[in-house]
Every structure is written in structure tokens, then in C-alpha cells.
């Protein structure tokens, strides 16, 4: 129809595994077409995610990399190594971003170690280095998410900002397209570059994606097609494509504006404050723990539970009956398997390891918390 459509897809390992278990070969084959057919490469970008739909801030730190690697392994097993090599962006479940310095550092380092080049983040989950919310303009440009741990080590990754909150209708009605139509170029790195409106839908909620999205997607692309030529008209574009075009224009992604997870400015402000000779002997990890404890004691609103697109809901409070067994299972898994894997990495291919890993990853699925009580928690 003369359109040049774009879409980014994020399927958890839970979902891919479930489709396989259900014997829905026709769905898997449709996804294989989107992942593997060269005609689809310019139009469809797959984003990586955790294998299970786990909330990063309250997932045990040693399991973050396991979640990332398990998804990559499963995706490659289904669609091949070439398809996996094209997966450069990461979509964290629930747009949940850790703000505890050590958790965020481990998360970003794991993403980088696993080959990811950029991350999609919720605008309210990040702040500028001096603790301010991102300006409207900054949410429409790429940023550099800096993660610093309690020992002062840093790692960073390019971040594209998802605006607004959790509302499937934002994608179901193609809100990003209509917002983008009214925008002008913005200054970045000595250039005037096109802003990017990035949005994500929370799967099938309330029939929106099934009943509203298909026609809205077509209508939006017809509007873009009919919007006139020239070099400045609005187009659909995927995340990696956008960043690669910026790099080709001479923009160095390592010089993007630096941002950090919310509440971290308050931590670093106290960490860097002058201290007595006695307190300066305290190591960084202990000092970080002290600072966080002091902030939590003085301000009940200060939280290290991370931020997501549902900031009115906590992923931690009231879920001890799920979180504590999950953490115990994780600790037992690593206590048992880590020495074995260190001595013989082929252990990860054994049925015992893979069954234990499967149950560990499944136990960390956020939906079991979000939906409260019942058979799972019992």
C-alpha cells in the first residue's frame, strides 16, 4: 500500500515457551517469518527481555544475567543465531528499572556483557545527574544511563525513553505517531536531530491490542504515507535504526546526556559529603548501606525498590510470602550449582541444572505477585 511500517516486538521466554507447550506451531511460524525473513528485517525489530517476566529491582542480583542469557538462548534456539545477532535493544518487563546502585550496576553490566547496545526506560524511572526530572525535550532524545555501584565503579548504556505511564491505549491508538507529527527537530551534539517518540504496550489488556490496534496501526501508516514528501516529514522508525542513523550522521553515543535511576542523586550527595576520619575508614559497600538506611529513616517516601510504569503499585510491599521463598530458592540454586559450574561449565547443559534453572526463572515471574494470592502463592 505504499507504506513503510515499523514495529518493535518484545516476547518473554514465558510466552514463547507457552506457545510451544500449547502446540501453536502456526504462531511460532508467523513469529519466525517476522524474525527471519529478509523482507521483514527493515520493518520488524525484536527486543530482548528477561526469560520470565521478572521485575528487575526485586530479582536477586545473581539471577539478572541468567534471565538475560536464558532469553537469548531460547530465542536463538527458535529463530537462529543470525536472528539473535539482530537483537540489540532490551525491553525490561514492566519497564521496571532498579535504582539500588548495586542492582542497577549489575543489571547494566549484564546487558553490556550480553551484547545489548541500548535499553528502553520509563521516563519517571530516571533523573538527571543533579536529581531533576528529565525535561520534555530530553525524553524525546537518546540519553546515556550511568550505573554506579557502591565501590564507585561505573558502566553505562544508551537509553531510549518511554513516555507517560502504563496504558495499552497509548499504543492501541498509535499515540506516538500523532504526538510525533507535531514535533520539530531538537539540538543534540551540535546537530539538529529528529526527536523520537517511543511507546510500549503491556500486551493484551482489555482487548485493546486485539480489537483496536490493528486498524489504528494501518491508519497511522496511511497518514504518514499521505503526509507529503521532503526531508522533514514524520516517519515510523525502530530504536536500533534510529541510533544507527544518528551514529552515521556523526553523533557519538558515548557523549549523550547522562542520566541515572531516580533517587540516586540523594545517595551520591551524601556519599560524597565530607566525613570524619573515623567514618572514612568505612568501606564503600558499608557506607552505601548506611546512607540508604539514613535516607529511609529520615524520609518514608525514599525507596530503593526501583521504579516502573506502575509507580502507584509496589512490587515488594505485601509480597513477602512470594519474595522470601523466591530469594531462598535463588540462594540455594547458586549455593549448589555455582561451584559445580565453575569447575565444569558443561554442567549448564545437564537436565538437573536446566530443570532447576527453569523453576528458578519461573518463580521470579512478576505476574505471580501482581495477581496476589491463590494457587501459586499457596
Regions found by a protein language model. Name each.
Residues 1, 14, 136-167, 175-179, ...:
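Active-site and substrate-binding clefts of carbohydrate-active enzymes
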Residues 94-95, 203:
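Active-site metal-binding loops of divalent metal-dependent hydrolases
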Residues 1-89, 95-168, 175-194, 211-231:
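Catalytic alpha-helical scaffold of carbohydrate-active enzymes acting on polysaccharides/glycoconjugates
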Amino acid at each position: 500500500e505504499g507504506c513503510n511500517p515499523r514495529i518493535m516486538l518484545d516476547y518473554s521466554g514465558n510466552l514463547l515457551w507457552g506457545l510451544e507447550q500449547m502446540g501453536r506451531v502456526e504462531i511460532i511460524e508467523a513469529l519466525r517469518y517476522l524474525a527471519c525473513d529478509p523482507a521483514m528485517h527493515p520493518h520488524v525489530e525484536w527486543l530482548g527481555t528477561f526469560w520470565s517476566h521478572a521485575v528487575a529491582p526485586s530479582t536477586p542480583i545473581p539471577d539478572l544475567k541468567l534471565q538475560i542469557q536464558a532469553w537469548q538462548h531460547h530465542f536463538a534456539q527458535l529463530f537462529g543465531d543470525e536472528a539473535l545477532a539482530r537483537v540489540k535493544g532490551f525491553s525490561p518487563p514492566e519497564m521496571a528499572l532498579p535504582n539500588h546502585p548495586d542492582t542497577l550496576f549489575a543489571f547494566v553490566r549484564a546487558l553490556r556483557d550480553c551484547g545489548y547496545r541500548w535499553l528502553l526506560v520509563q521516563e519517571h524511572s530516571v533523573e538527571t545527574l543533579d536529581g531533576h526530572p528529565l525535561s520534555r525535550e530530553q525524553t524525546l532524545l537518546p540519553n546515556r544511563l550511568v550505573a554506579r555501584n557502591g565501590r564507585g565503579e561505573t558502566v553505562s548504556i544508551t537509553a531510549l525513553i518511554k513516555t507517560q505511564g502504563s496504558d495499552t491505549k497509548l499504543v492501541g491508538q498509535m499515540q506516538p505517531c500523532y504526538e510525533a507529527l507535531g514535533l520539530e527537530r531538537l539540538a543534540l551534539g551540535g546537530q539538529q536531530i529528529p526527536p523520537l517518540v517511543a511507546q510500549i504496550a503491556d500486551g493484551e489488556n482489555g482487548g485493546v491490542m486485539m480489537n483496536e490496534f490493528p486498524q489504528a496501526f494501518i491508519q497511522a501508516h496511511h497518514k504518514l504515507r499521505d503526509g507529503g514528501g521532503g526531508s522533514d516529514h514524520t516517519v515510523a522508525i525502530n530504536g536500533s535504526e534510529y541510533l544507527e542513523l544518528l551514529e552515521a550522521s556523526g553523533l557519538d553515543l558515548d557523549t549523550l546526556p547522562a542520566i541515572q535511576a531516580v533517587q540516586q542523586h540523594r545517595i551520591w550527595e551524601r556519599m560524597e559529603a565530607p566525613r570524619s576520619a573515623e567514618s572514612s575508614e568505612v568501606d564503600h559497600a558499608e557506607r552505601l548501606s548506611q546512607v540508604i538506611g539514613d535516607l529511609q529513616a529520615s524520609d518514608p517516601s525514599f525507596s530503593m525498590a526501583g521504579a516502573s510504569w506502575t509507580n502507584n503499585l509496589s512490587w515488594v510491599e505485601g509480597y513477602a510470602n512470594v519474595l522470601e521463598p523466591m530469594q531462598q530458592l535463588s540462594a540455594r540454586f547458586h549455593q549448589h550449582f555455582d561451584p559445580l559450574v565453575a569447575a565444569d561449565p558443561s554442567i549448564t547443559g545437564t537436565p538437573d541444572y536446566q530443570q532447576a534453572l527453569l523453576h528458578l526463572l519461573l518463580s521470579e515471574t512478576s505476574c505471580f505477585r501482581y495477581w496476589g494470592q491463590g494457587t501459586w502463592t499457596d
